[in-house]
Amino acid sequence: MTMISVNEFKNGLTIEYNNDLWRIVEFQHVKPGKGSAFVRSKLKSLRTGAVQEYTFRSTAKVNTADIQTKAMQYLYNDGTSFVFMDTNTYEQLEIPEAQVERESKFLKENMVVNVITHEGETLGVDLPNTVDLEVAETEPNIKGDTSSGGGKPATMETGLVVNVPFFINQGDVLTINTADGTYVSRANK
């Protein structure tokens, strides 16, 4: 744990603030014409997943959090928790559903993700930037149905609903952005 000035903020940095652990989502240095400079930031709680905006004076200092990440393989969901396995020791770890609620729509069995911990407390999982998911259900493509633009909804194998272009069919494997749950492209097979 190190004290840093808010002027040293970087996206992705984890800090301790108000008795919680926060990951910096975005920040902006503001120097108004009158008054002192400040840093406006969006922080995501690693414990609750809530995103909040905070403003710090440019002279403020905060503690960085010492978090650890460990690559683990997702095995299954038993209804109340998600079970992950350390691929080196074969030790299993159960994470309550509430801690991975947002990420659960992107998790496929046998997928390797980074599990985040702080002082022995499991905080959640870090997903890769994109994941490849198969389309489980979508409306069939109708020729010439491109005049309206946009797309159509498709339900992925994990239950995630994504707006996709009209040419996408059931069974296609798509690359999905995990940050916002949007369609990126067809996956290379």
Swiss-Prot record:
Write out the pathway annotation from the protein's UniProt entry. Answer: Protein biosynthesis; polypeptide chain elongation
Per the record, its GO cellular-component terms are: cytoplasm
> What are the UniProt keywords, alphabetically?
Cytoplasm, Elongation factor, Protein biosynthesis
Q: Which Pfam families match?
A: EFP (PF01132), EFP_N (PF08207), Elong-fact-P_C (PF09285)
Asked if the keyword Cytoplasm belongs to this entry, the reply reads yes
Major localization class: cytoplasm
Coiled-coil segments on the chain, per record: none
Per its UniProt record, what Gene3D superfamilies does this chain match? 2.30.30.30, Nucleic acid-binding proteins
Cell location: Cytoplasm
Is Transmembrane helix a UniProt keyword of this protein?
no
What GO biological process, any one, is recorded here? peptide biosynthetic process
According to the UniProt entry, its GO molecular function terms are:
translation elongation factor activity
- Tell me which InterPro entries the record gives: Elong-fact-P_C, NA-bd_OB-fold, Rib_uL2_dom2, Transl_elong_fac_P/YeiP, Transl_elong_KOW-like, Transl_elong_P/YeiP_cen, Transl_elong_P/YeiP_CS, Transl_elongation_fac_P
Query: Per its database record, what is this protein's job?
Result: Involved in peptide bond synthesis. Stimulates efficient translation and peptide-bond synthesis on native or reconstituted 70S ribosomes in vitro. Probably functions indirectly by altering the affinity of the ribosome for aminoacyl-tRNA, thus increasing their reactivity as acceptors for peptidyl transferase.
Which family is this protein grouped under?
Belongs to the elongation factor P family.
- What protein name does the entry list? Elongation factor P 2
